[in-house]
């Protein structure tokens, strides 16, 4: 399992939101590229970028910051937020991103995921954000009537590289990930699952490592590495040593 630092972009800054609320944000850096380099130097093998403005607007909004990050780092980066069509996917991949994340559009237009996987094999990730097991879309502003497991199963055979599962009631709240829901999703599908939302201590990392056999291959952490609750280098070292759970 790998630990993946998150860089959430809002108006060109690196921020963290509480429970996905755009008006409950904390700015941690006005230089996202510098921040990205810091996480690379701490040993990160992959960066998780989110265009928050794009997620709410439905179109890319932080292109300059994203380009600057890609130029600054040598490790792979994946990006989500506002990706709703093939043209946007192609444009982002051509910038140098390793993978793109389809979120809202995966629920509203599953055919886009299938087409994107065919056109860009191994480079498409589906982001599933859920509250009480039900999928949330449009930057978490809208709750749907489809379950996270049912949505994930739609993509079982189309070549999705991973599913990022975020429990939005946990995100930015430093309360630990939803282990039960994450494990249930991972066990229901054959696609690798990356856990997100609430990962806020080394113990949380250990708990996720303990369910790695279910298919949980990564943990995204955001607020905790910015506040110092998690030392990223220590977390990465922990996953490399293996769980003693």
UniProtKB/Swiss-Prot annotation:
Query: Where does the UniProt annotation locate this protein?
Result: Cytoplasm
Gene Ontology terms: cellular component: cytoplasm
State the family it belongs to: Belongs to the HisA/HisF family.
Active-site feature positions: 8 (proton acceptor), 129 (proton donor)
Q: Which organism is it from?
A: Trichlorobacter lovleyi (strain ATCC BAA-1151 / DSM 17278 / SZ)
* Molecular function (Gene Ontology), one example: 1-(5-phosphoribosyl)-5-[(5-phosphoribosylamino)methylideneamino]imidazole-4-carboxamide isomerase activity
Entry's CDD domains?
HisA
One biological process GO term for this chain?
Answer: L-tryptophan biosynthetic process
Q: Which reaction does it catalyse?
A: 1-(5-phospho-beta-D-ribosyl)-5-[(5-phospho-beta-D-ribosylamino)methylideneamino]imidazole-4-carboxamide = 5-[(5-phospho-1-deoxy-D-ribulos-1-ylimino)methylamino]-1-(5-phospho-beta-D-ribosyl)imidazole-4-carboxamide
Recorded metabolic or biological pathway in which this protein acts: Amino-acid biosynthesis; L-histidine biosynthesis; L-histidine from 5-phospho-alpha-D-ribose 1-diphosphate: step 4/9
Tell me which Gene3D superfamilies the record gives.
Aldolase class I
* Class of enzymatic activity (EC top level): isomerase
Q: Which coarse location class describes where this protein primarily resides?
A: cytoplasm
- Might you give the EC number(s) for this enzyme? 5.3.1.16
- Alphabetized UniProt keyword annotations: Amino-acid biosynthesis, Cytoplasm, Histidine biosynthesis, Isomerase
NCBIfam families from the entry?
1-(5-phosphoribosyl)-5-[(5-phosphoribosylamino)methylideneamino]imidazole-4-carboxamide isomerase, PRK13585.1
| Entry protein name | 1-(5-phosphoribosyl)-5-[(5-phosphoribosylamino)methylideneamino] imidazole-4-carboxamide isomerase
Query: What superkingdom does the record give?
Result: Bacteria
Lineage runs:
Bacteria, Pseudomonadati, Thermodesulfobacteriota, Desulfuromonadia, Geobacterales
